[in-house]
Amino acid sequence: MNRNRIYDIVQKGSVSILIFGTVGGTVLLGQSYYSHRQRRLAALQEFQQREKIKEEGFAEDEFNQLALK
C-alpha cells in the first residue's frame, strides 16, 4: 500500500464519520426538541387546568358570599 492510498482511506473514513456524526447529532437534537416541546405543552395544559379550577373556585366563593349577604 502506498502512502497516497492510506491517506485516501483515512480521508474517506473521516468524511464518513463526520457525515454520520452530523446526521446522528441532528436526529438526537430533533428528538430532544420534540420531547421538550411535548413536556412544555403538557405543563401548559396542566397550568391552564389549574387556572380554570381556581377561577371556578373564585366564582363559587363570590356566589357564596353574595348568598350570605
Swiss-Prot record:
Mark the transmembrane ranges.
13-35
Name a single GO biological process: mitochondrial cytochrome c oxidase assembly
Q: Which UniProt keywords apply?
A: Membrane, Transmembrane, Transmembrane helix
Tree of life domain:
Eukaryota
- InterPro entries per the record? COX14 (IPR029208)
GO CC term (a single one): mitochondrial inner membrane
**Where does this polypeptide localize?**
Membrane
The record describes its membrane topology as: Single-pass membrane protein
Q: Which residues form a coiled coil?
A: none
Q: What is this protein called?
A: Uncharacterized membrane protein C757.15
User: Which organism was this protein described from?
Assistant: Schizosaccharomyces pombe (strain 972 / ATCC 24843)
What does the organism's lineage look like at the top?
Eukaryota, Fungi, Dikarya, Ascomycota, Taphrinomycotina
